[in-house]
Amino acid sequence: MGLIQLQNKTGWMLVEPVLKCNHNDVMKEDIRPDTPQPCPVARSLDVIGDRWSLLIVRDAFDGISRFGDFQRSLGAARNILADRLRRLVEAGILETRPAAEGSAYLEYVLTAQGLELFPVIVALRQWGEGHLFAPGEAHSLLLDRQTGLPVAPMLPRGGDGRALLPGQTVVQKID
């Protein structure tokens, strides 16, 4: 397989593609539900890969915790929202707690496992900010509360701290 060109904010670069997962072999529709996915990306998508689940997680990071508030923010049908919240609780991404003021309402809050999705949400947001809006088009921007400055771009880093590009990584199977 030859080099491919990828564009980033600084221009074009040549990278050698590295096969991460054979996506044709792990399409969810093509395998039985009880068959474990061989790829961490595929397994992650099984848990949080649909639109509503990721948006629920995004809203939870933004402080939303009640069913009605999720519904107002997302505009999702009640049955779909209830299903996704249930799945996220079952997956250990969210947990339910009694509402703070002691009412009969439940709140959905991120677990430690759910909090680890913050870099995923930030990376998706930054990619969207950089690629899905026309110049001058209004959109939200993630800012550092302390400085008021935009959050620095998310970059994978090596164990020594240097930024890594796609051609500088390799997937190794662990048995």
Language-model regions, residue ranges each:
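Basic, amphipathic "hinge/linker" alpha-helix immediately C-terminal to the N-terminal HTH DNA-binding motif
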Residues: 49, 100-121
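N-terminal helix-turn-helix DNA-binding core of bacterial DNA-binding proteins
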Residues: 39-80
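Canonical helix-turn-helix DNA-binding module
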Residues: 67, 71-99, 103
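C-terminal regulatory/oligomerization modules of transcriptional regulators
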Residues: 2-25, 122, 126-175
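Membrane-interacting alpha-helical segments
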Residues: 8-28, 71, 76-86
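Short, Lys/Arg-enriched N-terminal segment that forms or immediately precedes the first helix
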Residues: 23-45
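Alpha-helical linker/hinge and terminal dimerization helices associated
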Residues: 44, 54, 91, 120-131
